[in-house]
Regions:
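N-terminal glycine-rich anion-binding loop in soluble enzyme alpha/beta folds
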Residues: 2-62, 66-69
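A generic, well-ordered mixed alpha/beta core segment in the N-terminal half of proteins
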Residues: 92-157
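Ligand-binding beta-strand-loop-alpha-helix segment within the catalytic cores
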Residues: 134-216
């Protein structure tokens, strides 16, 4: 049987210099991903780095993170969004225990999610077209495609109140208060493992710049209502993270989402400079998110844009991953 003939390559009118330049530009091949019985997530991420589109960014981000974990670099995670309730809580716990993160800067909502599961409750899958009026009547809260029990969440509020009741009167940073929460959970009967406890046990500072905007703040407010003299001083936070940044030397940031945690983690450099500390700018970064850079919001702004603000080093090594954090985060490892 006669085989089909493939047409010849069309000719071109390119000059020799153009041909050389074209060959240079077309020298870095997009490699096809081959799955076999020996593949795991690490292998897949390595293959991604030679693919294209966001797969390449994911692979390059994983490679950059892996390389920096082998160096004396302090790594700050800036986390926002419903990451823990959506399934990334255990990865965060494991990353803390495996020395893959040195500082957490987070939204407070993450720690109401963390506390909810520490108390033995769960988050539950649902369809996005569920009747929210019915959910309200049933005291069920919805986060897009998953649910939580409002009664359980109120237990979370009351647990943070109890912790506030027991801490000595005083003025604290959010970092100190979260450390106290982790210590409290480590001694709590029947408490499940948690990010707070892991951070306490590994001496990882946790900063919540907007701590009033969550169950932690509600618990503290309830305690204050009954006469407790406890104040969370956000400016004390600023001073502490500035001092921390000045002492940590080389540093980089892993940004998931954006918002206040992203800005706070980056701004630690400026805070330290303004407080007359000798400080190095962040020299590597990875950002994972879906926000568009064109709307001018902080969450979507690139890590290179922050160079102009003096937050990141002019030679920062960074990777921007445009996509959902839940898909793109996997567990890293560190040699010590």
């Amino acid at each position: 049987m006669m085989k089909n003939k493939i047409p010849k390559m069309p000719s071109s009118n390119l000059s020799n210099d153009q041909v050389l330049r074209k060959n240079e530009l077309l020298s870095n091949e997009v490699k096809q991903i081959v799955l076999d019985g020996n593949h795991n997530v690490a292998n897949l991420l390595e293959d991604f780095s030679d693919a294209s589109f966001e797969a390449r960014n994911i692979g390059q981000a994983a490679k950059l993170y892996s390389q920096r974990l082998q160096t004396d670099t302090s790594i700050i995670w800036a986390l926002s969004g419903s990451l823990f309730s959506a399934g990334l809580r255990q990865i965060t716990i494991d990353a803390i225990r495996k020395n893959c993160v040195d500082v957490l800067v987070c939204t407070g909502a993450l720690f109401e999610q963390d506390m909810l599961e520490a108390l033995g409750h769960k988050h539950y899958k649902c369809e996005t077209n569920v009747d929210d009026r019915e959910l309200q009547n049933l005291m069920i809260d919805r986060v897009y495609d998953h649910l939580l029990d409002e009664i359980a969440l109120r237990q979370v509020d009351l647990t943070f109140k109890k912790i506030s009741d027991e801490i000595p009167n005083g003025i604290y940073s959010s970092r100190y208060f979260m450390q106290y929460c982790g210590e409290w959970l480590s001694k709590a009967e029947k408490a499940q493992d948690s990010v707070m406890q892991a951070a306490f046990e590994k001496n990882i500072p946790v900063f919540i710049p907007a701590i009033n905007d969550c169950s932690v703040g509600i618990g503290i407010a309830l305690s204050q209502k009954q006469g407790k003299q406890i104040i969370i001083d956000s400016i004390k936070d600023l001073r502490e993270i500035a001092l921390m940044k000045s002492e940590c030397g080389n540093s980089g940031i892993i940004v998931v989402g954006g918002g206040v945690p992203k800005n706070y983690a980056q701004d630690s450099v400026i805070m330290a400079e303004m407080l007359d500390y000798q400080v190095e700018k962040h020299n590597f970064g990875i950002q994972i998110g879906t926000e568009d850079i064109r709307d001018g919001g902080l969450s979507g702004s690139t890590l290179k844009e922050a160079i102009s603000w003096g937050k990141n080093d002019q030679e920062i090594e960074d990777v921007m991953v445009w996509g959902l954090s839940l898909i793109h985060i996997s567990e890293p490892t560190r040699p010590y």
